[in-house]
């Protein structure tokens, strides 16, 4: 008989000033195929919280507008499906990265916002403009 392993994760009630836990684990792809996309370890949850506190909330305040996470945490399955890095593991799988979009002001580009973030004191280790077709977003990690 297989042993069942129970893991209890502590999810902070107030996950951030501008972001919710649910927004950071939501995956349209996971919903579409009917699988869960949730952290399995407390370390992943803690990393997501640190990402919000140290990067996402400060970026939201720096650019003074809503920031929409489109790909925060990714389970191993979702990461494989979307073509994320496996070796080394994607920072999304560790809870250390999020792909975000926001409304651009007139004359602004994702590149100019990325430069503004890099010049700030926000501790990002990656601030990358990514694009697919006409869509663009920022990959932010901590």
What does each model-found stretch correspond to?
Residues 1-62, 133:
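Extracytoplasmic cell-surface/polysaccharide-interacting catalytic and binding patches
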Residues 40, 69-74, 109-115:
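N-terminal start-of-chain detector that recognizes signal peptides
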Residues 44, 51-55, 65, 78, ...:
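Amphipathic alpha-helical interface surfaces
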Residues 53-84:
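Extended, low-complexity, intrinsically disordered C-terminal regulatory tails
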Residues 67, 98, 137-138:
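A broad, low-specificity signal marking well-ordered, structured residues that form hydrophobic/aromatic
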Residues 76-98:
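Short, surface-exposed glycine/acidic/tryptophan-bearing loops
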Residues 89-92, 102-142:
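Catalytic cores and adjacent binding grooves of peptidoglycan-active enzymes
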């Amino acid at each position: 008989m297989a042993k069942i392993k129970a893991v209890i994760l502590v999810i902070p009630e107030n996950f951030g000033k501008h972001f919710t836990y649910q927004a950071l684990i939501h995956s349209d792809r996971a919903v579409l195929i009917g699988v869960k996309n949730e952290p399995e370890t407390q370390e992943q949850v803690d990393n997501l919280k640190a990402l919000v506190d140290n990067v996402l909330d400060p970026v939201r305040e720096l650019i003074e507008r809503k920031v929409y996470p489109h790909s925060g945490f990714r389970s191993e399955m979702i990461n494989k499906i979307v073509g994320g890095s496996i070796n080394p593991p994607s920072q999304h799988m560790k809870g250390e990265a999020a792909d975000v979009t926001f409304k651009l002001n007139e004359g602004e580009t994702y590149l100019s916002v990325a430069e503004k973030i890099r010049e700030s004191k926000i501790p990002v280790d990656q601030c990358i403009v990514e694009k697919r077709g006409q869509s663009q977003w920022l990959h932010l990690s901590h």
